[in-house]
Amino acid sequence: MTDLGLYLSRKSVNRSDVSRKTGISKTRLSELANNTKTKLRADELYLIALAIDVDPCEILKKVCKDLALKEE
């Protein structure tokens, strides 16, 4: 499961509702939640955040928590 999948699961998000509100297919949401090789686009993240009524930055911090700048 991806970080997005874990986040949505912890929030008890109904993916059918998210799909209906955002226009993102249930298949795509499933890929985003389960396949670590699938890349989440910024527009998808923003729409998902709007659909579940959270600040997009909250999701971004969870999904990108492992990213860091390279040390010089």
Briefly describe each language-model feature range.
Residues 2-21:
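Short basic helix-loop element that most often maps to the first helix and adjoining turn
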Residues 25-38:
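Recognition helix of helix-turn-helix/homeodomain-like DNA-binding domains
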Residues 36-50:
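Short, basic-rich loop-to-helix N-cap that marks the start of a DNA-contacting helix
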Residues 6-7, 12, 31-32, 50, ...:
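Short, charged recognition helix plus adjacent turn
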Residues 17, 28, 58:
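Residues in the helix-turn-helix
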